[in-house]
Amino acid sequence: MEKGGNIQLEIPDFSNSVLSHLNQLRMQGRLCDIVVNVQGQAFRAHKVVLAASSPYFRDHMSLNEMSTVSISVIKNPTVFEQLLSFCYTGRICLQLADIISYLTAASFLQMQHIIDKCTQILEGIHFKINVAEVEAELSQTRTKHQERPPESHRVTPNLNRSLSPRHNTPKGNRRGQVSAVLDIRELSPPEESTSPQIIEPSSDVESREPILRINRAGQWYVETGVADRGGRSDDEVRVLGAVHIKTENLEEWLGPENQPSGEDGSSAEEVTAMVIDTTGHGSVGQENYTLGSSGAKVARPTSSEVDRFSPSGSVVPLTERHRARSESPGRMDEPKQPSSQVEESAMMGVSGYVEYLREQEVSERWFRYNPRLTCIYCAKSFNQKGSLDRHMRLHMGITPFVCRMCGKKYTRKDQLEYHIRKHTGNKPFHCHVCGKSFPFQAILNQHFRKNHPGCIPLEGPHSISPETTVTSRGQAEEESPSQEETVAPGEAVQGSVSTTGPD
C-alpha cells in the first residue's frame, strides 16, 4: 500500500448515533448550555441542536450570550417537550386534539417539517370529524323511514333539534352567528355543471333522501319524507359519495315578512352550492346559480377548481368573498352573461367552460387560498413564507429584534436597522446635487421629488457600510420620518451594528 494513498472510512448512521447520545445527555441534564422556559417549566437543551433544528433559534441575535430563553407564545409545555424531543430524535407523538397547538408552536419555531405534517393531517380529517356524525344520523333516519308508512313527510320529534338561539352546541361555538342556512343533501349540481361526480337520474328514485338542515350557528335537524316523481324539482338528483351544501335564502326560516325586498322588487335569490366529498379527500367543488321568480335556473359558475379549507374549519373563500363585496359596493357582483349563442355553446363545453371560469376569477378581488401559507388566526393567505412569518409575529406579539444599545424591541429587522442608524448616525444615501445624506433610499427619493424635480438619484453603492437595507420603497416611506438631515462634508460614516434575525 502506498504511503500517500487515502483511505475513506464511512460509518453508517453515525450522525444518528451522535444525536441519540446528545438526547441521552439532555435527559440526564449533562453538558446542557441553555434552559428554555415555557409556562413556568424549564427544559434543558443544547444550543447547537436547537440552532440546527429551528431557524428561530439559529437566527436569534443574542443566543450566544444567553443561558435562558423564555417563550410565552407556546401555551402548552407538553407541546414544546414533544417538539424538543423531535429536534433530537426526528420522531414525535402528538394528540389529535392538540394539532392546532402543535401547528402554532411549529410556526413560531419555524420547523417546516412539523408544519407540513400538521397541515396534511388537518386537510385529511377536516370533514371526517363532522361527516361521521352526519352519516350516523342519516343512517338512523333511513332505518326509521323504512319502518314508517309512505304518507309521513315530516321528521319525528326525537330527530328534531331546536333551532332557537338558546340551543347552544359545540358547533355553534366554533362558527359565527351568521344568518344564512346550509342545506346539506345528497344532491348533484345542475345539468350545466361539469362536475366529475357520478350522477344517477332522479326519475328512478321514488322516495326523497333525508335532508340534514344546518344553520351557520351549528344547530341542525334531520328532515325526511317521500316526494312523488312529478313534484321533484330539477336540482334534486343524487351524487354518489358526496353531500350537497346549498346556501338558501332566509325566507323559509324567518318568514316572508322578515325578508328585505330588493330595489327592483324581484324575488330572485342567490344560491351557492358546494359539493363536499365524504370520502375523506377534503375537496370541495363550488358553483353558483340563480333561482328566478319562475324557478328557472341560470348557470353562474365562479370556480371550477378545488377550494381548500383553513385549519380553523371556516370556509375561507366564502367569507373573503362576502368581505370583498361589503368593502366594494360599487363593484359588479354579477358575472358576465354570454352575449351570443356561440359564446353560450362554448361555455357549455369543457374548454369554453374553463376559459369562462378563468375570466371570472380574474375579476374577483379575493385571491386563491393557499393552505401552506395561511394565517391560522385570521385565515389570511400570503404568497411568500417570509410575509406569513412577519404577519404571525404581529398576532403573537413577538419582538425578536432587540437593540443592544437601548433595549428597544421590534417586530421586523428593517425597523431595528432604522433605529440603529439613529444611534450610529449612518446615512449611506447621498444626494449628488446638494451633498445631503440620508439613512434610507426612500427618504433620498422624497428629497429629490421635493427639492430637485426632474433629477433622479445616481445608481450604484452609496456607502461602504456593511449594513444592508432590506426595506422596500413603500415600507420605508410609511415607517421612516420625512425629515431631512444634513451631514457636513467630510464627515465619516460610522459603522453599523450587525443585526440578524429571521427573514
From Swiss-Prot:
GO terms for molecular function: DNA-binding transcription factor activity, RNA polymerase II-specific; DNA-binding transcription repressor activity, RNA polymerase II-specific; RNA polymerase II cis-regulatory region sequence-specific DNA binding; sequence-specific double-stranded DNA binding; zinc ion binding. It is found in: Nucleus. Residues 155-167, 465-474 have a biased composition (Polar residues). SMART domains: BTB, ZnF_C2H2. Residues 32-96 form the BTB domain. PROSITE patterns: BTB, ZINC_FINGER_C2H2_1, ZINC_FINGER_C2H2_2. This is Zinc finger and BTB domain-containing protein 37. It comes from Homo sapiens (Human). The gene is ZBTB37.
